C-alpha cells in the first residue's frame, strides 16, 4: 500500500499495480514542536519573518544557483515588504556546501534545517519553522510549496533556478502561477496547491489508524 498527497498523484502511480491512497499534505499530521507560549515568545523576538527555501543542490536532481544573486533578491524582498528577520531553511547537506550557510549568515539571515527527511521529527521541525514565518518564498517548486500554502503562509517563487521552458510540462502551471504575486494569483495558488497536495484528501486519526494497521 502506497500513500501519497492527492488523487492526481494516485493516477500517476497507477502503473505500480499496488493500492495507492491519497491522504493530503503530510505536514497536516505533524505536530508543532513549540507550545503556544513558546511560539508567541519566539515570534515576538523574530518580528515579521520571511522564510526562504533554497533549492536542494546536494541530492540527485539538485540544481545549482547563484547564491550572491539570491541574497540580493532576498534583501530586496526584505526591504520591500518590511521584514525584520529572514530565515533560510536549507537541505541538511547543503548548509556547508561551498560555504552557502556562512554566506547567508553574513547577509544577516538566520540559517536552519529541518534535518534528514527520514528523521522521525523532520516534519515536526518543518511545520514549526513554517509556522514561525509570516511569508515564504523559494527559488523552485517543491514539497515545501504545498506545505506553506496549506499552513496559510503566502508563497512566492523568486529568482527561479529554471525557466518555464526548462520545467517539466507536468509542473509548468505551478511554476508559472507561483512566480506571480497578485491577489488573483493567491487564489490560484491555493487552488493549484490543493490539486497537487490533496487538501481535500485529509484523513481523520481513525482513518489513518485503519490504513496503517
Regions of interest found by a model, annotated:
Residues 1, 48, 131-134:
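Conserved acidic residues
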Residues 3-6, 53-55, 89-93, 114-116, ...:
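Short His-Asn-centered micro-motif
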Residues 17-18, 82-83, 152-154:
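A short helix->loop->beta-strand "cap" motif at the edges of active sites that frequently abuts
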Residues 23-33:
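Short beta-strand->alpha-helix junction loop in the catalytic core
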Residues 95-151, 155:
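Donor nucleotide-activated moiety binding/catalytic core segment of transferases
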Residues 165-213:
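Leloir-type glycosyltransferase catalytic cores
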Amino acid at each position: 500500500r502506497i500513500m501519497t498527497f492527492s488523487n492526481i498523484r494516485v493516477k500517476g502511480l497507477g502503473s505500480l499495480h499496488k493500492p495507492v491512497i491519497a491522504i493530503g499534505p503530510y505536514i497536516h499530521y505533524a505536530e508543532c514542536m513549540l507550545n503556544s507560549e513558546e511560539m508567541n515568545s519566539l515570534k515576538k523576538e523574530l518580528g515579521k519573518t520571511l522564510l526562504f527555501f533554497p533549492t536542494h543542490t546536494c541530492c540527485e536532481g539538485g540544481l545549482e544557483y547563484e547564491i550572491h544573486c539570491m541574497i540580493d533578491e532576498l534583501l530586496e524582498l526584505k526591504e520591500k515588504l518590511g521584514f525584520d528577520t529572514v530565515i533560510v531553511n536549507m537541505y541538511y547537506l547543503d548548509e556547508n556546501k561551498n560555504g552557502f550557510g556562512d554566506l547567508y549568515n553574513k547577509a544577516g539571515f538566520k540559517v536552519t534545517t529541518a534535518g534528514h527527511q527520514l528523521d522521525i521529527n523532520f516534519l515536526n521541525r518543518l511545520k514549526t519553522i513554517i509556522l514561525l514565518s509570516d511569508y515564504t518564498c523559494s527559488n523552485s517548486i517543491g514539497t515545501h510549496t504545498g506545505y506553506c500554502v496549506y499552513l496559510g503562509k503566502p508563497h512566492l517563487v523568486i529568482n527561479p533556478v529554471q525557466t518555464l521552458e526548462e520545467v517539466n510540462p507536468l509542473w509548468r502551471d505551478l511554476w508559472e502561477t507561483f512566480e506571480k504575486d497578485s491577489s488573483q494569483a493567491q487564489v490560484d495558488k491555493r487552488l493549484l496547491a490543493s490539486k497537487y497536495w490533496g487538501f481535500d484528501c485529509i484523513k481523520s486519526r481513525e482513518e489513518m489508524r485503519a490504513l496503517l494497521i
